């Protein structure tokens, strides 16, 4: 429903199910790093669960859950036991629909420290400079250095604005793999996400990266 594409592959006789939800925001990132901060805050509490309650519930059901920002999309994924698929989707639904983003300052400071520590590695510095130069002036060139240079421009308001685009101006795709029938997947997904705004595949406003000869 809502034009959300759902792909399901059944792997019989396997004990766990994996789900990946990819959401491509149709607008260019307002500030380098703002989508990364938003993704980190998805696991820091919702209107229904505090961060501690969320962590405890994921641990109690042995659900591996993560959210991260890629160059082209936001990825939320989990791996759960077969019998806990509906519970894992319910938690995903809560995170997607009801995240509060209350720990913004704390998470921003934490991310800044992690990026600085990451750049202590010579290997990381090489990759950082390589991609920064290769995709200069393009979102693919959003490196740790570029995020650190712009980190003071990342605000709570911009995170909320990005979240609005995440919900209302984005293409949404869900993939599920495990020992589960496609009809059951469809029923659970529809029940959880039928109220989400429609998935829209607007042409990207990001320019195509160009490799220039020296």
Question: What is each of the regions a protein language model found here?
Answer:
Residues 45-48, 97-103:
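Short, polar/flexible loop-turn hinges at active-site or ligand-entry regions and domain interfaces
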